[in-house]
Swiss-Prot record:
The gene is rps8. This is Small ribosomal subunit protein uS8c. Keywords: Chloroplast, Plastid, Ribonucleoprotein, Ribosomal protein, RNA-binding, rRNA-binding. Signal peptide: none annotated. GO terms for molecular function: rRNA binding; structural constituent of ribosome. One of the primary rRNA binding proteins, it binds directly to 16S rRNA central domain where it helps coordinate assembly of the platform of the 30S subunit.
Amino acid sequence: MGKDTIADIITSIRNADMNRKGTVRIGSTNITESIVKILLREGFIENVRKHRESNQYFLILTLRHRRNKKESYKTILNLKRISRPGLRIYSNSQRIPRILGGIGIVILSTSQGIMTDREARLKRIGGEILCYIW
């Protein structure tokens, strides 16, 4: 039984967003750094810092919160893990799903690295569907 780092960061971000926390601290690996770069580029998180504590690196994410006039707080970040260690889900470039008609993003692991669904369609490559974000 291995550790699923992608599910861990998705759960950490989702829990912090639901509890109105401003920051999240997650372990730094190559995969988590790639996913966090995509989240930052797409505007789902506000800031990222790399922090070192006794030979271990951590990423400190600053979450983006939007306030609604009717409610004091509204969760805008929804994440769902798709492919998992027990059941891998693959897709070619034509069958990559669109989330909310293109508003959300799909993060894929391809032969050219971790990228969004739009980038994979432009490059016409498929891969393993890691998660949905909307």
